[in-house]
Amino acid sequence: KIEIKAKKIAHSLIELLDVEGLLAVEFLLDKNDNLFVNEVAPRPHNSGHHTIEANLTSQFEQHLRAILNLPPGNTKIKSPAVMFNLLGEENFAGPAVYEGFKEALELDRVYIHIYGKKETFPYRKMGHITVLSDTIEDATQKAIKLKKLVRVKSKQ
């Protein structure tokens, strides 16, 4: 029911805005199952970055196909995935220092993406990590452990 309502709202926005390419529509859901549009982005969006590894065609390729008037690619999921943002730690600001990468990269099917921002500050999006696994439950558990392990702090 909620998914159908979200799709209807998103389709209405697409038609209203006459978008060519991707249109990411981010919703918030309250405890009464009311949907609220939180963000509309006419571009690839952070919430779809997992498609880089998890889908046959990523959101980036889909966007290019759309604006170049090419047929859309297959969106089939290759693997269950969990993605989370790497955010600057609270109480840290300055040149970014990443902790826990070595340990994270020792794990199979873990993909770290750093956005190249030299300076961090609390809650700044500095990158993301995507975890693939055979089940969503296993990917979720691995992501929870990684979120505690990988940190973005600063030299100062």
Where are these regions (language model features)?
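Peripheral (often C-terminal) accessory segments that flank ATP-dependent C-N-forming ligase machineries
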Residues: 65-156
